[in-house]
Amino acid sequence: TTDAYTNSKTNMSQLFGRSTIVDGKKTITGDSLFHNDKLKQNEGFGNVIYTDTENKNELRCDHLFYNETTGYGYATKRALMLDYSQKDTLYVQTDSVYRKVHAFNHVRAYRDDVQAVCDSLVFSSQDSCMTMYRDPIVWNFGRQLLGEVIHVYMNDSTVRKAEIVGQALSVEKCDEKNHFNQISSKRMDAFF
């Protein structure tokens, strides 16, 4: 950093100019960083990059807040999550993202084998389930899935199954020109 201020009485630091905070296998880089060692809080502004080399993921945004003690955190303004723990990187782009991964407004998730869009998304690492709300659409190898809510279950970052709830529709292009297979129901399970 080129400009920093530290208060040893309060254990608070402010770093200005392009700066980096390193904590074990995690780093936060940003144009301005604020660190409260007593409360174990970090906040970054401007082109923030949070990297966790142990879990092989990265978060990029313009505003980041993270509390190490509670695990609560959020990222706003052009948030982009990258999970490179598997051979194929998973990208999730959204306006805002929260620690349990709550992504809001204009969510896009993509990698080579699957793409998805929706208004809101919740990802739980406990059951490896990604739940998409409000006009969700999932594309996978020439197939399009639509519904009111879509639950995508993963196994080691590989899509295993999707549950489409409410006005479920699957559209798949046939080999022939302009012909499609279509299935519609109240609820549908799709296996990959």
Across the structure, where does each feature detected by a protein language model lie?
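Structural signature for solvent-exposed beta-strand/loop edge elements and short helix-capping sites
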Residues: T1-F192
